Amino acid sequence: MTIQEYKQQLYDACKEHIFLAQQALDRYSTAKTDREREYAKIDNLQHLAAHNALQWALYKASELERRNEQ
């Protein structure tokens, strides 16, 4: 796998987690019980955390790519 392919996979995963975080936020806003809201909030936070970790990995992969080009 090339670094470009790896970066594309990271980017795709970032997009997926943002989509899932938004879905959780939508579930939170339409929740009828405190328990539903709490689960939606937890899901949202987990997807945002995953997105942030993937963004960091994407940044590091880009850094590595730049170093290899020099």
What positions do the PLM features span?
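Short, charge/polar-rich alpha-helical segments
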Residues: 1-18
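Short, charge-rich amphipathic interface segments used for partner binding and complex assembly
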Residues: 13-19, 23-69
